[in-house]
C-alpha cells in the first residue's frame, strides 16, 4: 500500500474517521482516567496505548480481510467508567480492564456473538446504523445557529463541489472551514505539545466484587453498544468478515494492552461508516484503503498521545460537527433507504431507527442495542401475524 497512490478523498476519509472519533470522545477517556486517579503522564500513556492498539488492530484486520474494518475504543464504556471507577484505585481499575477483555475473548471463542449477529435482518441493521448516525446530521445543521458564517460557508462549498466533483466535496468543505477558522482567530494551539509518550505499565489488582460491579457491566456495554453496532454497520454496508475472529483478535489485543490503560478495543460503527461510504472510494472493493489509512493515523495519534486533547481543544466544535455531518450524509441516506426499502420489514425498521435515535439508555446499555431488540421484537411479531393471516 503506497500512500502516494491513494486518491485524496480516500486519504481524507481515513483522516476524518480518526479525527471525529477522537474529537467526539477523547475528553470522556481523560475524565475516566482522572476518576481512576491517573496522573497526567499516565493519562497521556493511556492515550498512546489506545492509539497503538486501535492502529494495530485496524491495519491488521483491514489488510488481512481486504474490507474496511475500523476499530475504536468504546465510548459508552468510557462513560460507564466515569462513574464505575469512583472509589477504585488505579491498580484495581487495571484489574477491571483485564477481566473485561478476557470476557470479550471468551465470548468470541465460543462463537455465541457470531451466531447472534447472523440472525439480525439486514433492514434492522441498516435502521440501527441510521439511528446511530442521525445525531451527527442533526448537529451539523444545528451548528448553523451559533457559527453561521463558518458552517454556512462549509455547507455552500460542499454543495457547489458536490455538483461538479462529488468525491472532493468534503475536502473542499474542510479546507474552506480551516481558512475561515484561522481568519477568525478561533484556533488556540498553546496547549498542543508534540512529544512522544511511552505507555506506563500499571500492576493490576483483582477483586471479585469489582469484577461483578464494574468489569461485567463494561463487558456487556462494550459488546452491546460497540461490537454489535459495529458488526451490524459493516453488514449494512455490504461487507462480510468472520465475526468471531474479529472479536477474538480485538479482545486479545486489548487484553495485552490492558496494563497500559486500554479498557477496550471494539469494532467501530460511526467512524467506520465514513470509510465504508461512496465518498471514501467509488469502488466498494477499494474502500478498505480508507480504513488502512485510518489505521496509520491511529498509530500517529498514539505516538503523540499527549497532544491529542490539546488538538481537539484547538478546533471549534462547530467545525467538527459540520464536517462529520457532511461526511456521513450519504451513509445516513443509504442506510435509511436500505432500512425502509422492504415494505414487509418497514415498521420494524422504523421502530429500530427511532429507538436507536432516541438516545435511550437502560441498565447502562445504549440505545443501539435497545433499537435492535425493539426492532427485532416487532419484526418477529409482525411476521408471525402476517404468516398466520396468509394461511
From Swiss-Prot:
Membrane topology, from the record: Multi-pass membrane protein
Transmembrane among keywords: yes
GO molecular function, one term: benzoate transmembrane transporter activity
Periplasmic side: 31-42, 115-123, 189-200, 268-287, 333-361
Compartment annotation: Cell inner membrane
Transmembrane segments: 10-30, 43-63, 94-114, 124-144, 168-188, 201-221, 247-267, 288-308, 312-332, 362-382
Membrane topology, Cytoplasmic segments: 1-9, 64-93, 145-167, 222-246, 309-311, 383-391
Chief localization: membrane
Keyword Cell membrane applies: yes
Pfam families attached to this UniProt entry: BenE
GO CC annotation terms, alphabetical: plasma membrane
This protein's UniProt keywords: Cell inner membrane, Cell membrane, Membrane, Transmembrane, Transmembrane helix
Record PANTHER family: INNER MEMBRANE PROTEIN YDCO, MFS FAMILY TRANSPORTER, PREDICTED SUBSTRATE BENZOATE
Entry protein name: Inner membrane protein YdcO
Taxonomic lineage: Bacteria, Pseudomonadati, Pseudomonadota, Gammaproteobacteria, Enterobacterales
Gene: ydcO
Amino acid at each position: 500500500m503506497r500512500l502516494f497512490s491513494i486518491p485524496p478523498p480516500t486519504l481524507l476519509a481515513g483522516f476524518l474517521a480518526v479525527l471525529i472519533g477522537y474529537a467526539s470522545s477523547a475528553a470522556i477517556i481523560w475524565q475516566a482516567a482522572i476518576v481512576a486517579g491517573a496522573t497526567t503522564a499516565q493519562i497521556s500513556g493511556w492515550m498512546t496505548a489506545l492509539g497503538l492498539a486501535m492502529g494495530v488492530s485496524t491495519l491488521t484486520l483491514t489488510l488481512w480481510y481486504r474490507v474496511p474494518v475500523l476499530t475504536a475504543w468504546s465510548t459508552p464504556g468510557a462513560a460507564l467508567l466515569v462513574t464505575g471507577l469512583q472509589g477504585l484505585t488505579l491498580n484495581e481499575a487495571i484489574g477491571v480492564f483485564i477481566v473485561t477483555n478476557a470476557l470479550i475473548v471468551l465470548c468470541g471463542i465460543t462463537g455465541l456473538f457470531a451466531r447472534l449477529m447472523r440472525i439480525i435482518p439486514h433492514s434492522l441493521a441498516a435502521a440501527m446504523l441510521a439511528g446511530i448516525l442521525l445525531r451527527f446530521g442533526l448537529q451539523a445543521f444545528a451548528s448553523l445557529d451559533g457559527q453561521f458564517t463558518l458552517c454556512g460557508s462549509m455547507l455552500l462549498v460542499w454543495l457547489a463541489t458536490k455538483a461538479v466533483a462529488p468525491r472532493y466535496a468534503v475536502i473542499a468543505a474542510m479546507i474552506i472551514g480551516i481558512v475561515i477558522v484561522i481568519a477568525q482567530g478561533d484556533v488556540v494551539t498553546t496547549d498542543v505539545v508534540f512529544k512522544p509518550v511511552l505507555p506506563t505499565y500499571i500492576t493490576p489488582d483483582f477483586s471479585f466484587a469489582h469484577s461483578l460491579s464494574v468489569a461485567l457491566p463494561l463487558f456487556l456495554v462494550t459488546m452491546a453498544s460497540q461490537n454489535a453496532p459495529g458488526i451490524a454497520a459493516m453488514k449494512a454496508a455490504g461487507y462480510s468478515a468472520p465475526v468471531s475472529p474479529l472479536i477474538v483478535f480485538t479482545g486479545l489485543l486489548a487484553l495485552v494492552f490492558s496494563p497500559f490503560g486500554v479498557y477496550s478495543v471494539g469494532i467501530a460503527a460511526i467512524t467506520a461508516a465514513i470509510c465504508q461510504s461512496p465518498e471514501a472510494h467509488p469502488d466498494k472493493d477499494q474502500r478498505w484503503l480508507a480504513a488502512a489509512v485510518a489505521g496509520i493515523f491511529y498509530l500517529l495519534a498514539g505516538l503523540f498521545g499527549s497532544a491529542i486533547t490539546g488538538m481537539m481543544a484547538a478546533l471549534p466544535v462547530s467545525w467538527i460537527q459540520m464536517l462529520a455531518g457532511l461526511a456521513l450524509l450519504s451513509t445516513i441516506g443509504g442506510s435509511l433507504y436500505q432500512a425502509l426499502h422492504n415494505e414487509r420489514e418497514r415498521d420494524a425498521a422504523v421502530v429500530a431507527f427511532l429507538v436507536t435515535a432516541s438516545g435511550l439508555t437502560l441498565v447502562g446499555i445504549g440505545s443501539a442495542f435497545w433499537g435492535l431488540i425493539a426492532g427485532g421484537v416487532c419484526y418477529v411479531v409482525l411476521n408471525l401475524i402476517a404468516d398466520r393471516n396468509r394461511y
